[in-house]
Every structure is written in C-alpha cells, then in structure tokens.
Amino acid sequence: MAFVSCFHLRLLFLCLALFMAAECRPDELNKKVDSDETISDDDVSARVQPNGGKIMIVRDNDYDASDDNDNDNDDDDNNDNDNDNDDDNDVDRDNDNDDDDFDDSNDDMLSFELDSIEEKDSDGNDVGSTEGHSVESFEDRPFSLSSVDRNSNALGVAAINVNLSTKLEDSNADVDIMLYLFREDGTISFGNETFDVQAGTVKFNIKISNWDFCDGSAQDCSEAKAGEYLDVNIKFKSKDTPIEVTDEERKSQNKPAVCKDKDTPDTDSDPDDSSDNANDGDDDDDDDCPHIYNMGGDSEMLLNRGVMNGDTYTAMPFGFPKVEIEDGEKKIKFRVPKFDDNVNIDPSVTPGRVPKNASPSPALCLKIHILFIALLQAVTLFINSW
C-alpha cells in the first residue's frame, strides 16, 4: 500500500512537471518581467512590446461584463487590491488565457509593427544610401513606454492611451506611436476625413519629427537627389489578406456605416449648405472617407487618405496608402509628402467578434495534445507497474 501511495505521489509530481513544461514556453521563461504593456476595456485588449514597438490586438469573446465592476479606486494599478473584482491593467490576474490570445498562432489576433522608412525623390526613387535618410528595420529597436492613461480621449472620444517613442540616431529624428483604445462609440475627424469609431476600436497615431530630407546635393545624399517623400512601411498580421470594401457593401451586410452618407442634410448653419439638394447625388461639404479594409474574421481596418503635416492636412499621392504582399509578409505602405517639423499617420482597426463555436487556437490544441500524451504515458507506466 505504501508503494502504491509513493508511486501515486511520484505520478502526481510527474504529471505536474509535464503540465508545467507544456504550459511554460522557453520564450516566456526568458521574457523580461513587465517588459510589455497591455491595456484592456470590455472585451478588447491591446498589447505593446517596447522591443520593436509591436502592437497586438485581440477580442475576448468569452468576456463577462461583470468583470468591469471594479470597486477599487486605483487609476494606474500601482495600488492594486488582490480582492478587487477587476484590474484593467493586471493581465495575469484577470485574463488567464491572455498569453494564448497574444500568441502568433492565434489566427484572430491582429498585429502591427513598423518595418522600415525609405526616403524617395519626386519620382518615387531612392535618394541614395547616405546614413540618416532611411531606416532598414525596426526589429529589436528599443522603444520607451509612457504610463497608461485610462482617462484619456482622442478628439473628444473617451479612450485608454499608452505611447511609445524612439530616437533614430543616424538622422536624429523621433518616432512616436500614440495608441488609443476607444471606450465608447464616437465620431472623429482627421483633416478632411470624418469617420465613426466603436468601443473597442484601436487607433495608433504614428508621428515622425525632425526628419532631415536630402537637399539634392551629392554631399547630402549619394544620388544627389532631393527628398520629396517618406515611404513608411508597416508589416502586419491578420486572419485573411485585406480586401478593400465600400460603406455600401458593408451596409448590405447590416454593418453600421463608417462615414456619413452623402447628401444627408447638415444641422449646422454653414451658408454653403443652404442650397444643398439631398437628392442631387453630390455634396461638397461631405468629408472624405478613409479606405476601409476587411481583414477577415470580421475585423476591419481604416487607412486615412492623407496625413497631417503639422496642422495641415495633406493628401498622399494617388495609389497610397496601399496594402501589398512582400516576401510573404503583409505590409501597408504610406507615402508621406515632405514635411517641415512633423507628420502624423493615423490608421485604426476594429477587431472582429469570433463565433462562440469557433475552434480552439492551435497553441491550445498543442498543449492539450502534449498533456494527453503525457497522461497516456503515465497511465501506461502505472499499468505496467502492476
């Protein structure tokens, strides 16, 4: 009997060890504690990685609204109470499957990261290889993280905000990424573009400052060309290859419009509206609508047609921004016209809702498979011992 008890104890420890081995991946063991920052509201979470500036976005379709009944008064989780109902920034305590959600094997996760910056001349050709006029890769580039502001807003719409920033040593330029997770539905404007966002939409404003463009001399750039554009490239992950859709196509699928319909009578006192005909098929006062992309899995992405050059809205050249596949990777290419002090690019994305009966992620299936094999081997050993 003692032998059986000892064997059972050893078997228990063996199963526990095997389960922990399956649960803890080497990359997680080597990961620096608190190196990433995760912000959450309702069923949407966004995680940012300071090493490379990667942004990952997921929607928790098993979300329980009761988790939002947080009775503590902490704003930044510095004084977290283990007994509170929820802690929006305490990922490990509130979301047991969070790491699985943010695993690259999760087909429903959306991710975005800066890939490169290339200076171009007026014809779209490289200006040359002189240092300071391109960034070949942002991989492993360190970004500093701001504190999380849960009471922020973007253009009047309540949001949670966290910022990333890095300095480009060769050019002495600065790159800032301002991430906003909207907490409510609303309407925002970006220059000449006005569009709706939802609670759960994530907007990440990319700001480039103090870029020194080539002046056309051989001393400044090897090809003696003047810089007129910056190609800002973002690589991303989505369930499917994005397909551009129109608001009319979306409405046929019973989705709410992203942009205001043309010829909808305005409610302001703008005299330009006085002669507007709601049936004329034209309305000069309507703002532009961003490009709308279906990313698969019910997720959508909005890409603005222009950028903000300081306080001035400037349209990108025809054909930009564009989505392309390069070396097997999905990329967004923004062609930014030359600017003086700073420029802002402002994409946004709304993660889709995965059906409740969706299959478990490959990462979870792998863990279950490993655990099943381990238990099967343990049972075999137990039977053979008798």
From Swiss-Prot:
Residues 63-107, 266-288 have a biased composition (Acidic residues). Residues 133-142, 244-265 have a biased composition (Basic and acidic residues). The keyword Signal applies. Keywords: Secreted, Signal. It comes from the Eukaryota. It is found in: Secreted. GO terms for cellular component: extracellular region. Its main location: secreted. The keyword Signal applies. Component of the acid-insoluble and acid-soluble organic matrix of the aragonitic skeleton (at protein level). Residues 1-24 form the signal peptide. Residues 33-145, 244-291 are annotated as: Disordered. This is Skeletal aspartic acid-rich protein 1. It comes from Acropora millepora. The lineage of its organism: Eukaryota, Metazoa, Cnidaria, Anthozoa, Hexacorallia.
